[in-house]
Structure formats: structure tokens, C-alpha cells
Amino acid sequence: MRITGGTLKGRRIKTCRDNSTRPLLSRLRKSLFDVIGERIKGLSFLDLYAGSGAVGIEALSRGARRAVFVEKGPLAARVIEENIASYELFSQVKIWRKNVLAFLPILLEGEKFDFIFIAPPYYKKMQNKTLDIIEEVEINKATIIVQYSPHENINFTRRNMGIVKQKEYGDTILAFLEGTVHCS
């Protein structure tokens, strides 16, 4: 798997060999960042259920100011660290080895993000729980990208964010939501 654009274009991304993660295919990452476009430049990116870190690394390659990765799997977190080290990106990165659902409320109280990418394992029903947590905090017009299967029932009816675009790629859908108002 390789980075599809930006300063690191063409560089290899190491992935977990034990199939514990499901990396977003290169063509889907390219499509995701084609939608985001130049808006990523100079902004912050939160990669939840980060796996190999490919999406957050792609964001940095395309000009994001910083990326934060949250991944509870020890092997996956180690792969993220190795990828970050090989690209010498440590000054732009924070990696949290934490359970997303337990840690996200704490993280979002202390930091604001411009882009939030949610890609939990399929069929674990964590997209809705993750969106529930995000819905409870001020997201400052953040763009939230949710990766899911068409066989999953995701609730996109939210009081402080709305869906602006969905792109379907075979058995994967990327939904783009944007924050609309402050929610206390």
C-alpha cells in the first residue's frame, strides 16, 4: 500500500500483518482526499480507529498541520509509530494507545479538530456510538468522515452536524458530515 498524494506520494505504508486492521484501500483514500481537496492544508486531522495510520499519514502528506491517531491495538499502534518514524513526522503527530469510545470525550474536551475520520471495524456498531460522543461536544464546523458498509445502519440524523455527501465504492461507503452549531 502506498501514499496517493502530497509530499510523500508513492511512499510505502506499512500495515499490520495479522489482519487485525482493515486499511482503507489506496483508491478510496485518494477519493476521500479528492473530496477534501485543498481544505486540508494547515488544518488538524483526527484519525479514530487508526489501524496502520494510513489515512492520517495521507492527510499530513497532503498538507495537514498535524494528525492525532487513536488506536487501542498494540500491534497497530506500533505500526503507526514505525510509519511515522520512517517519514520523520513526529513533530506533527500524537499517537494515543486508547479505546476510542472511552478516550474520545476526554480528547475532544481538550482539543478541537478540523477533520475527524471514523473507521471502526465493520459490524461492530461503533460508528453510531462514536457519532453520539462527537454530538455531545462543540465540533466547530469540523468535517467528519465515516467509513461504513452498506449493510450497516448508521444514524446520520444529528442535532449539531449534517450529512453533506456520500460516496459509495463497492462494499464501502464514505459519508461526509459537517458541524453546524455549538451543542452544549
Predicted regions: what they are:
Residues 1-184:
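Class I S-adenosyl-L-methionine-dependent methyltransferase catalytic core
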